[in-house]
A protein has these predicted regions:
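Canonical positions in the second alpha-helix
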Residues: 122, 166-167, 201
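TPR alpha-solenoid repeat register
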Residues: 132, 177, 211-212, 220
Length: 224
């Protein structure tokens, strides 16, 4: 099984996110600025994404966030690798944590497009970040549960399942990912996989006294 989501080769839901690039315009930073900032090797002749609303306030941070937004929408974007290199040089891979926090906030407002975009950017910047995949799985799941169109639901459902699978590979201790992955397998009629996944969930949550864990454990025991 692959241990990362190759969105640049296989992007199930990008078609639903691409319209959001309409708020971005692209411009090149001046050669003198790039030299001064020590970024010429990464950004020479590379168009940089700016938001129409931020043209008076262009900072290292706004540029990095806009780059993350673009690759979150379109992981096959021509300058994706330049953008990731810029983010890692201007900040570091912990930049992904801020994107995850933003994504969680968007998801809490039921804006699952924006949430998915942040999480997709996060695991491109930090491919080992289990939380980014887990949160992406949750956002895709919440999106398809509100969806009505069959193709939309199918694409988000498949994306959600793969994200939860990869979350458990990146962090085999991430109990919540096993919980949702089990339901993903049940949805697909993969009952043996669901059973094994839920047994792992019960093993990981044994003796955990966190809020609501006991109810979830009972619910899963009832299903096994």
């Amino acid at each position: 099984r692959d241990n990362k989501m190759n969105l640049e080769q296989k992007d199930r839901i990008g078609q639903y996110l691409r319209p959001h690039l309409g708020q971005i315009i692209f411009d090149e930073l001046s050669e003198s600025y790039l030299e001064r900032a020590g970024l010429a090797d990464i950004l020479r002749d590379v168009p940089v994404p700016l938001r129409k609303t931020e043209l008076n306030n262009i900072t290292t941070l706004t540029i990095a966030r806009n780059m993350a937004f673009v690759i979150g929408v379109d992981p096959a974007f021509q300058y994706r690798d330049n953008y990731i290199a810029y983010i890692l040089r201007a900040f570091d891979k912990r930049f992904a944590e801020g994107l995850i926090a933003d994504g969680v906030e968007w998801a809490s407002k039921n804006d699952f497009d924006y949430a998915c975009i942040q999480f997709r950017a996060a695991f491109q910047i930090d491919p080992e970040n289990a939380d980014a995949y887990y949160c992406y799985g949750r956002a895709c799941k919440d999106a398809y549960e509100l969806g009505e169109e069959e193709e939309f639901i199918g694409r988000f459902k498949a994306e959600s399942l793969e994200a939860f699978e990869i979350a458990t590979i990146k962090n085999p201790q991430l109990a919540e990912a096993y919980y949702f992955l089990g339901y993903g397998y049940v949805n697909m009629g993969l009952y043996v996989k669901a059973k094994l996944t839920w047994e792992e969930y019960l093993k990981l949550t044994e003796g955990r006294a966190a809020d609501g864990i006991e109810e979830l454990r009972q619910e899963i025991r009832g299903r096994l």
